[in-house]
């Protein structure tokens, strides 16, 4: 439950859900039930919650890494993990408001704002995102589903650190 949280971090995602239960599907469909899966976030009525994050961490599969001639930068590699959202879940994430849906979640991110590796469902609350890249990103290739059932979303993307999609589900 977010109840007046004020979290800032410059060396990792400001909020990260790493070990959470995942739903029993590995295919994208119109009716993926994420209600009991992943991180379940509740934005408490009448509260303002501030989340600020700016860090991008990439962990590569060692056998795929190709370095430049000076051996100082990665030129090509397949990612094992990439943590680049200010508010991030390694699995699915559900965001809910309480009865009045009057709670506010403000996310400021140098890169991705609200980021889920699997499915993301927004059911309520007032969510304001300002990001340098994607405002909302779900990114498990061919599997991720982004669903907005309720609430109010305001997304401002600067494009400072990427192409800058409002909502990117890839």
Describe each PLM feature range.
Residues 1-170:
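A composition-driven surface/loop motif
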